[in-house]
Amino acid sequence: LPINIKPGQQDFYHVMLSLRLLTIIAGFAFAGSASAASIGIVAPQNGPYELLGQQVRQGAKAAAAKLGLDVVEIHESCEDGSGGAIADGLVAAKVSAAIGFLCTETLQGVLPPLKAAAIPAITLSSRAPILMEDALKYGWPLFRLAPSDRAESDRIAEIILRDWKGHSIGLVDDGTIYSRELVDRIRSALEENGLKPTFTDTMRPNQEQQVALVRRLARTGISHVFVGAERNDVAIIARDAASENLPLTIMGGDAMNAANNPVPLVANVLAVTRPAYDALPSAQAIAGELRGAGIEPEGYILPAYAAAELTAALAEAVQAQSKPGPEILAGGTVFKTVIGDLGFNPSHDLSDNPYRLQRWNGQRFEPADKAERQ
């Protein structure tokens, strides 16, 4: 029984009032089927994030239909103060878990009421560290399928320590806050383990060429460099290194998971990023089913499908163990899903770091065993 809670164009007060009235209706609608497992899908239905919200709904609803989950759809406006009304709808519908939550503004208001109702909130995208710190401090039931920023730097440092010892190493950021913090965490981890980079620099992003940077790397004798920058900037560095005949091993981070334009990435560039979900062995059958139904398994579709699978399994575990859902999730229980085994650590982040070393083959990224040129 889908319940669609969608604000119209009224002022904010009327939106909140109408949502609260609809939650009462939702409660009556679910009164006769309170024992059925249900999933709340909280995602934008209009506005700038409508396409992302559509991906969340398509993936979660496809899994729910297959698993027999009741569905409660709630619009996520991403406005400050909207979380309370969204929580009312989820609590009234007695959902087993709520997934989606693409906006931090929503989570700030939705989490306290969900704590009282023992309803886990599983965000597919929010990485805000302060929000998770508050969640752990106040016991809010927030769990992240999106990897933390620290997961990225931890994996990159691990790979550099494993594969680049004995080489002249460079670390380059693009001056943005995200990039500088990423590179700082990597450098700290390396130095704590006795590996000091030979070269560090801040590049100027969005330039037509990076020959000057490439020549500085060459003069310093750098053979391996990590570049914390957007994919196109890394592609320009790789192109210019090739034109200068510099055999440079280049590795980027999760920002490399982007469109291959305007400058195409040359083969052999490395990236530490999440694998394409539709390429995972565990996803092949479901990806085929989705394509057969006219749904391309891209973006949030497979993560949302996995979150629905997790919700169904969690509902069974709650009944079997007579424990609240958040307690089971925080206890490290692992669930099999379309994107692999998923579980959470005591910090409510994924227990298995999803970042993997990959190599660009000229068409797409593929798994790589070692961070070296081929």
Task: Give the predicted meaning of each segment.
Residues 4, 8-12, 17, 22-25, ...:
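Extracytosolic ligand-binding ectodomains
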